[in-house]
């Protein structure tokens, strides 16, 4: 599946409250995650997805997010070609933050930010 043809949803269509059966998968790198992420997100860096497929839910909605939407589109294409039903989040965490949706940081005392 081509990353340009993956199913997508905008941040405004998805947030601020995810559906009850939904998982928001953040595929950014560890430093990006630590600086700021959606509070309900699950973190698996893009480079680790193929080795961690067992960590992903087998049912429910899977929404994939990165910084701007490029990596998550590639991850969505990969997941869909391997049996999941994943949806890319257009605009990524940049759009999430710009819309004023909640962010948390893993760094003690640091204000959350998208890097």
List the predicted regions and their residue ranges:
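Rhodanese-like catalytic fold shared by cysteine-dependent sulfurtransferases
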Residues: 1-23, 29-61, 70-115
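Short, surface-exposed ligand- or partner-binding patches at beta-edge/loop junctions that are enriched
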Residues: 65
